[in-house]
Amino acid sequence: MIDVVIRAPLLSISGYGVHSRQVFKWLNERQDVNLHAQIVQWGNTSWMINSEYENGLVGEVMKASSNAETGKSDISFQIQLPDEWDPNLAKKNIGISAVVETDKCSSAWIDSINKMDAVIIPSEHVKQTILNSGHVTTDLFVIPEWYFEEIERNETTALESEKICL
């Protein structure tokens, strides 16, 4: 079993909250993962507190909530702003962030990026902005923030395929 901690605004009603729950769901469905959740605030957003929300996923998040001991987990996924990441949370640490919505990135965030083992970002634009903002020593992986789960499960009848451009 892989011991995994996810630190993220998992109960937040926000874009980062949605993305956090997508990552949580993926990890929670894996048979080889022992998952712990560290739920953090995202700005001044409201929280989902009904365990039935999102087909029971909110309840699964609540059950996984714990304070995993720093440095004990095999891997962490931290869905936060770069200066909020903890490079010592687990043996391997993956930062996930939208980072910027402009063409400039803070040098302090470049320093935070370089302390992680890898960073997942949502677009080539963000990747180029980071690379143009300083010397980056950490691998950057572009993974879009959202996808149709029906496509992953090959449930094409659940979607109007003519409306999906792949």
Model feature map: region roles:
Residues 1-73:
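N-terminal pre-catalytic "stem/leader" segment of glycosyltransferase-like enzymes
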Residues 5, 158-166:
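Conserved donor-binding/catalytic core segment of Leloir-type glycosyltransferases
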Residues 5, 45-131:
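Extended catalytic core of nucleotide-activated donor transferases of GT-like folds
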Residues 94-95, 137-144:
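Short hydrophobic/aromatic-enriched beta-strand-loop microsegments
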Residues 27-36, 117-124, 136-139:
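Structural alpha-beta junctions
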Residues 142-153:
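Short beta-strand->alpha-helix junction loop in the catalytic core
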